Amino acid sequence: MTPFFEQLSNILFLDIETASATESFAELDPRLQPEWIRKERLIRRESVLEPGELFFDRAGIHAEFGKVICVGVGFFQAKKKEKKHLFRSKVFAQEEEKETLLELKTLLEKKKWILCAHNGKEFDFPYLCRRMLIQGISLPEPLQLAGKKP
């Protein structure tokens, strides 16, 4: 196999799906409500909106007010004898976000993965890091991105 195909087995493709942490602004922890209102002022286009009106639609894209509901991953597995690659995929989706993140962490610690995601550097990776830290989970090596370049 060529070096390209050997390296292909080290790439973990991933995508996360997120949602607001609560169904409505009213259910949000009272300590976080003023923070959401501040955030909402930055994204609000019309000043006539009521506080919390954008919560359901927008909270999921902000790690402080959202949660990871599932993580889809995929990777190529080399079959050297047959000289081919199989693509394997898996979805992590548990009732509790912490369990989903712990399962992902276990996979990330199994080998030295190179992470690949659409807009991963700007969204998926920072979101996962923030949610892991909020849940009290230490960051696995592939998500320790400080100082790394694409």
Predicted segments, located by residue:
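Entry/capping segment at the start of metal-dependent catalytic domains
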Residues: 1-66
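Metal-dependent phosphoesterase core characteristic of DEDDh/y 3'-5' exonuclease domains
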Residues: 2-9, 66-95, 101, 105-150
